[in-house]
Amino acid sequence: MDPAGGPRGVLPRPCRVLVLLNPRGGKGKALQLFRSHVQPLLAEAEISFTLMLTERRNHARELVRSEELGRWDALVVMSGDGLMHEVVNGLMERPDWETAIQKPLCSLPAGSGNALAASLNHYAGYEQVTNEDLLTNCTLLLCRRLLSPMNLLSLHTASGLRLFSVLSLAWGFIADVDLESEKYRRLGEMRFTLGTFLRLAALRTYRGRLAYLPVGRVGSKTPASPVVVQQGPVDAHLVPLEEPVPSHWTVVPDEDFVLVLALLHSHLGSEMFAAPMGRCAAGVMHLFYVRAGVSRAMLLRLFLAMEKGRHMEYECPYLVYVPVVAFRLEPKDGKGVFAVDGELMVSEAVQGQVHPNYFWMVSGCVEPPPSWKPQQMPPPEEPL
């Protein structure tokens, strides 16, 4: 039983939630959509709320760092993927991060990038939908109160930054589309379609070194000197960036890429079913990369097919997929940017490791993702 008296993996009834809403996200209609589509359903489900509007970048991060979390049964994030990124990193920056990250989270889509909400919609067995239909589905998930544990990606950069990702890290084509389509934010998710066509017209390649720890080699060795962290979980599979990757890692021989994508969930957008191979096992992420040499026509076909998750059926020799638990990416020429959960970062060496079943989210079922033997882990502690 959790402290609120409800069974493990279920929010209590009645329920108290703090709603963090970005009124400028996506098409700028989040507050209007909350009043029209979310609030009536919450009232019927006996979910009381306090609404807080974010005013600037990292405002939500600052709020959750100091918020008295015991007042709430869950934190509801209504915006795009970037606001959930802020909230999770704010929780992990608290002195009580180990308990703070157990506070259940809920994603209500109202941004231009709604990949996390689309993934949860998919896991619940709903049809792929967008806009108000996706918002309604995710609100219904909140009303049903079921929780599921989620993987968390820990990242370290060459400049010494340590951060956490709830969705993805992209480099190359996808990150450039994120950056260059920012000016079309008012189009909602259509900005990414427009950005894709514009970037295809001037296709770039990016030079770098990619290495990863595949699922099958996790049990073989553990680094003698894992990377040192001041706060947060220990990344036992990572060594300092100035050292070579461990010998049991795979180093990709190619050094010219169109894109690299580490993805924790099924969707990269509400209409981008990027990982049709199924939900990641506990402690695993999807790693995709596209090698240089792919034609514009093939890349366009892949992105169009991704809407229905059929891009892997092309068996494109330039598109590589592997399930991994850790990776390292070292850009060589300074070109391009990183996009972490849709938030842009400078291009520099970065490495990351997945932590299994690390936090709770409102989902369609209480079942954790499938486990695989070498790193089978229990769900996180009971939600607070």
Curated annotation (Swiss-Prot):
Changing residue 81 to A: Loss of enzyme activity. It is found in: Cytoplasm; Nucleus; Cell membrane; Endosome membrane. The modification Phosphoserine is found at residue 225. It comes from the Eukaryota. Acetyltransferase activity increases in presence of the kinase substrate, sphingosine. In Purkinje cells, kinase activity on sphingosine increases in presence of VEGFA. In neurons, kinase activity increases during the first 24h in presence of Amyloid-beta protein 42 to decrease after 96h. Residues 12-159 form the DAGKc domain. GO terms for cellular component: cilium; clathrin-coated pit; cytoplasm; cytosol; early endosome membrane; endocytic vesicle; intracellular membrane-bounded organelle; membrane. The keyword Zinc does not apply. Interacts with ACY1. Binds to calmodulin. Interacts with SPHKAP. Interacts with CIB1, the interaction occurs in a calcium-dependent manner. Interacts with TRAF2. Interacts with EEF1A1; the interaction enhances SPHK1 kinase activity. It is a peripheral membrane protein. Changing residue 82 to D: Loss of enzyme activity. The modification Phosphothreonine is found at residue 193. Optimum pH is 7.4. Widely expressed with highest levels in adult liver, kidney, heart and skeletal muscle. Expressed in brain cortex (at protein level). A motif (Nuclear export signal 2) lies at residues 161-169. Catalyzes the phosphorylation of sphingosine to form sphingosine 1-phosphate (SPP), a lipid mediator with both intra- and extracellular functions. Also acts on D-erythro-sphingosine and to a lesser extent sphinganine, but not other lipids, such as D,L-threo-dihydrosphingosine, N,N-dimethylsphingosine, diacylglycerol, ceramide, or phosphatidylinositol. In contrast to proapoptotic SPHK2, has a negative effect on intracellular ceramide levels, enhances cell growth and inhibits apoptosis. Involved in the regulation of inflammatory response and neuroinflammation. Transmembrane segments: none annotated. This is Sphingosine kinase 1. ATP binds at residues 22-24, 54-58, 86, 111-113, 185, 191, 341-343. SUPFAM superfamilies: NAD kinase/diacylglycerol kinase-like. The gene is SPHK1. The active site is at residue 81. A motif (Nuclear export signal 1) lies at residues 147-155. It catalyses: a sphingoid base + ATP = a sphingoid 1-phosphate + ADP + H(+); L-seryl-[protein] + acetyl-CoA = O-acetyl-L-seryl-[protein] + CoA; sphinganine + ATP = sphinganine 1-phosphate + ADP + H(+); sphing-4-enine + ATP = sphing-4-enine 1-phosphate + ADP + H(+). It comes from Homo sapiens.
